[in-house]
C-alpha cells in the first residue's frame, strides 16, 4: 500500500524548521515519518472550530498541523503548542 506524499508549506521550510532546536527537529522528523506516512488519522486529532479540516500531531509540547488532500499530506505549520495555532490563518494548502 502506498503512503501519503508529505509536502511542506514554504514557510515551514523557511521559518518553522530552522527555528527548532536540533534535538526537537529530529524528534519531529521521526514522528512525521513514523506516524503520518500511512495512517495519519490514527495518530492525530482533528482541529475543532475550523472549516479547513485540519489535523494536529502532538510531539511532546510541539505540534505539527497538517491537511489531507487526496494522497497528499500538507504540513502547514510546526511549532510550540502555545503559539502554533496563531499561524494557521496565513497558511493554506496551495491550490491543486
List the predicted regions and their residue ranges.
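Enriched for short, Lys/Arg-rich terminal
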Residues: 3, 26, 41, 59-62, ...
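Active-site micro-motifs of SAM-dependent methyltransferase domains
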Residues: 14, 38, 83
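Residue-level recognition of oxygen-bearing side chains
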Residues: 11, 52, 83
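A short, surface-exposed loop/turn module that caps and links secondary-structure elements
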Residues: 33-58
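Arg/Lys-rich, positively charged N-terminal/basic patches that mediate binding to nucleic acids
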Residues: 1-31
Amino acid at each position: 500500500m502506498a503512503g501519503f506524499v508529505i509536502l511542506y508549506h514554504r514557510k515551514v521550510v523557511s521559518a518553522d524548521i530552522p527555528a527548532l532546536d536540533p534535538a526537537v527537529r529530529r524528534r519531529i522528523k521521526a514522528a512525521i515519518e513514523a506516524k503520518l506516512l500511512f495512517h495519519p488519522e490514527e495518530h492525530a486529532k482533528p482541529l475543532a472550530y475550523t472549516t479547513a479540516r485540519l489535523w494536529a500531531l502532538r510531539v511532546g509540547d510541539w505540534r505539527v498541523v497538517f491537511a489531507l488532500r487526496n494522497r497528499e499530506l500538507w504540513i502547514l505549520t510546526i511549532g510550540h503548542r502555545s503559539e502554533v495555532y496563531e499561524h494557521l490563518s496565513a497558511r493554506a494548502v496551495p491550490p491543486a
